């Protein structure tokens, strides 16, 4: 087992309310045994102190109130900690090594020879790690409800604890009402702490071993090696299997326990650095404390820092979150609205979306409702959480959304002929544009200033930087371009130096380099404007932008521009007029697409087809147009869109983007600084 050390946790209850010293981390413990281990750690490393509370919820509340800083929690408690009233986030995951990594298997275990299966548990005595915990409660109870073993219609009918009490003969589920049947088998106070001997994995197993219960809901590593031969796993198909067959016989694979703290990157880094710096102490052993799994699981091999944008939803994943919600929220009743919630990025898109909502009313109900977020990544999160349903995004964002489990369902078509006679997949050309006569070529861009549509965008980042990376094999693009504007970078990056912000006299800097229309150099039009206003020497955009913005077609800032004032930079080192994009481009790439959750595909497609029949380019209702720039350029959809076309059902993001694009993306993903924090969070683990 890899030895990791956690810093000392000095402190005592009397100092709980004192403001922490600079660089101090206060760990929350839930029992005297954990406190003893915590104090022993304090003898090894300065900078930690201990805060004693009675259970996980009290620790969560203490961290929220800044009376403590961190605690390791299981998935069920991570969910609670992430709710709006606490707003904590997982920052470090336990790593169990081998194939488990930062996930583990939730299993049901019984003594060998007892001859009942998972579907025969009614009337049996059960041992649970704790009420609301992952392997001990949420997964087994959620599974039993799903397969119809436990009859429960939702909390509007009765609490799930009542249904579980009716199902099992008796139980020990620490954290339940002490006088209830769910505490009948417990040996101590039935609290969710080590004050209850049957609490946690080792306690639930002890409950089974002692004969108090007939089945224990635990994790796959709980049964000691010397005792495995005496126990068996209960599989969901009602068969049994040896303890080591957990990969094929388990209830679910769930995210590892994780350290949670407040949403403060500096505090998260401090906690991680303290843990990694501890020496001469085995952080993952509870030997000598007459208990197991104190502060961390004893089976932990390592600790892994999570991406800073990871929240409880991203860490736990949509499937596990759905399981928890099914046990804690009322089931949906009544008729739901036949509307889709569109996610608008920034104020300008929200204004257009609100107008769409008003015009979409049919028979007294709107077909489009609006949610807004500051960035596309935040919209993707909202769609994952079911707070929004859909948004149209560029190919790079389709890639990120796909990594987060969303799917492309409709694609923008820029050729009107193909709207009525679909054929080749909708696409556009990614191009590099410079001012005519600048002397620049594709091969002389090093040291110049660059204008990008945004970090992670197709034409503006992924294609040009992928080509540059393939040539230089250097991920530090600040050594290639001297500075530029690539909205989405940290504001102190050289790739934000040339960004303009909102242009407002008050509070404008807050929008600088933000990946939304509030940043004037964001998106296709913004990147072109960056070039026009001499903030950059080259703009990476799509082939239609120059003609759309020049020769009298553009906004005020582009009024006097001629398309002939600009030229394309070809990969062979030559330049060509902007009309020669078919011979002079960086790549031909998929058009922008509407993304949603897989289960929402049908409804989103149906409503959008209906909406474009009314408000599309050839729509029956002239009061609103989905694709015209009446509210500003390229809002909600590209202005060049002629129609939306359905993507064949079952198409995943990889198939939509195509092999060439996927190869380019995989190459660029060798550079961590070209991967968004959201994508890192979504791909951190897949349980």
UniProtKB/Swiss-Prot annotation:
SMART domains (UniProt xref): TR_FER
Signal sequence coordinates: 1-18
GO cellular component annotations of the record: early endosome; extracellular space; plasma membrane; recycling endosome
Residues annotated as domain Transferrin-like: 25-329, 340-670
Main localization, broad class: secreted
Pfam families cross-referenced by the UniProt entry: Transferrin
Keyword terms: Disulfide bond, Glycoprotein, Ion transport, Iron, Iron transport, Metal-binding, Repeat, Secreted, Signal, Transport
Keyword Chaperone in record: no
Binding site for Fe(3+) 1: 74, 104, 201, 257
Gene Ontology biological-process entries: antibacterial humoral response; iron ion transport
Domain of life: Eukaryota
GO molecular function, one term: metal ion binding
SUPFAM superfamilies for the chain: Periplasmic binding protein-like II (SSF53850)
Record-annotated disulphide pairs: 28-50, 127-207, 172-186, 235-249, 343-379, 353-370, 404-682, 419-643, 451-530, 475-671, 485-499, 496-513, 570-584
Glycosylation, residue list: 169, 673
Binding site for hydrogencarbonate 1: 129, 134, 136-137
Binding site for hydrogencarbonate 2: 453, 457, 459-460
Subcellular location: Secreted
Gene3D superfamilies xrefs: Periplasmic binding protein-like II
Residue sites binding Fe(3+) 2 per the record: 394, 428, 524, 592
Assembly with partners or alone: Monomer.
Role this protein plays: Transferrins are iron binding transport proteins which can bind two Fe(3+) ions in association with the binding of an anion, usually bicarbonate.
PANTHER family named among the record's database cross-references: SEROTRANSFERRIN, TRANSFERRIN
Entry similarity comment: Belongs to the transferrin family.
Official protein name in the record: Serotransferrin
């Amino acid at each position: 087992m890899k030895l990791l050390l956690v810093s000392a946790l000095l402190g005592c209850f009397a100092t709980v309310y004192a403001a922490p010293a600079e660089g101090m981390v206060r760990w929350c413990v839930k029992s005297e045994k954990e406190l003893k281990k915590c104090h022993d750690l304090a003898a090894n490393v300065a900078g930690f102190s201990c805060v004693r509370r009675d259970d996980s919820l009290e620790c969560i509340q203490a961290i929220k109130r800044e009376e403590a800083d961190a605690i390791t929690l299981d998935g069920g408690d991570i969910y609670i900690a992430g709710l709006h009233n606490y707003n904590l986030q997982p920052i470090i995951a336990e790593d169990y090594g081998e194939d488990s990594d930062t996930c583990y298997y939730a299993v049901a275990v019984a003594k060998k020879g007892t001859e009942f299966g998972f579907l025969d548990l009614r009337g049996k005595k059960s041992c649970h790690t704790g009420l609301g915990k992952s392997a001990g409660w949420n997964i087994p109870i959620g599974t039993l409800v799903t397969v119809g073993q436990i009859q429960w219609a939702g909390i509007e009918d009765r609490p799930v604890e009542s249904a579980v009490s009716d199902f099992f003969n008796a139980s020990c589920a620490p954290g339940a009402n002490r006088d209830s049947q769910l505490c009948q088998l417990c040996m101590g106070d039935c609290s969710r702490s080590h004050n209850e001997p049957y609490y946690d994995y080792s306690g639930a197993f002890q409950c089974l071993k002692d004969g108090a219960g007939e089945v224990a809901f635990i994790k796959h590593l709980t049964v000691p090696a010397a005792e495995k031969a005496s126990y068996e796993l209960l599989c969901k198909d009602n068969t049994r299997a040896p303890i080591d067959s957990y990969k094929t016989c388990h209830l679910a694979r769930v995210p590892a326990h994780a350290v949670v703290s407040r949403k403060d990157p500096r505090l998260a880094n401090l906690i991680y650095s303290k843990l990694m710096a501890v020496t001469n102490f085995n952080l993952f052993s509870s030997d000598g404390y007459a208990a197991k799994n104190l502060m961390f699981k004893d089976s932990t091999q390592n600790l892994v820092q999570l991406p800073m944008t990871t929240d409880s939803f991203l860490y736990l994943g949509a499937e596990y979150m759905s399981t928890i919600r099914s046990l804690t929220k009322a089931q949906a009743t009544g008729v739901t609205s036949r509307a889709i919630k569109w996610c608008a990025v920034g104020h300008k898109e929200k204004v257009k979306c609100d107008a769409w909502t008003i015009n979409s009313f049919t028979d007294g109900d709107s077909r489009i409702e609006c949610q807004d977020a500051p960035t596309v990544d935040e919209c993707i999160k909202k769609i994952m959480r079911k707070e929004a349903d859909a948004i149209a995004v560029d190919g790079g964002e389709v890639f990120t959304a796909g990594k987060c489990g969303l799917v492309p369902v409709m694609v923008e078509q820029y050729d009107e002929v193909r709207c009525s006679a679909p054929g080749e997949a909708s696409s556009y050309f990614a191009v590099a544009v410079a001012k005519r006569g600048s002397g620049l070529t594709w091969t002389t861009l090093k040291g110049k200033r660059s204008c990008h549509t945004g970090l992670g965008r197709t034409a503006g980042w992924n294609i040009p930087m992928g080509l540059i990376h393939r040539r230089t094999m250097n991920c530090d693009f600040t050594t290639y371009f001297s500075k530029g504007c690539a909205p989405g970078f940290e504001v102190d990056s050289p790739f934000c130096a040339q960004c303009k912000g909102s242009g407002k006299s008050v509070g404008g800097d807050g929008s600088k380099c933000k990946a939304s229309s509030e940043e004037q150099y964001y998106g296709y039009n913004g990147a072109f404007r960056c070039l026009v206003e001499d903030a950059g020497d080259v703009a990476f955009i799509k082939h239609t932008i120059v003609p759309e913005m020049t020769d009298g077609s553009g906004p005020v800032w582009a009024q006097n521009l001629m398309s002939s004032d600009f030229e394309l930079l070809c990969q062979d080192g030559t330049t060509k007029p902007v009309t020669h994009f078919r011979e002079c481009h960086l790549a031909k790439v998929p058009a922008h697409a509407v993304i949603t959750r897989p289960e929402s595909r049908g409804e989103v497609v149906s409503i959008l087809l209906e909406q474009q029949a009314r408000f599309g380019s050839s729509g029956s209702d002239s009061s609103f147009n989905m694709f015209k720039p009446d509210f500003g350029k390229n809002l909600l959809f590209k202005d060049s869109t002629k129609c939306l076309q359905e993507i064949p059902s079952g198409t995943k993001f990889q198939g939509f983007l195509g092999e060439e694009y996927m190869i380019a993306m995989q190459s660029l993903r060798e550079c961590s600084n070209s991967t968004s924090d959201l994508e890192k969070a979504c791909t951190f683990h897949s349980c």
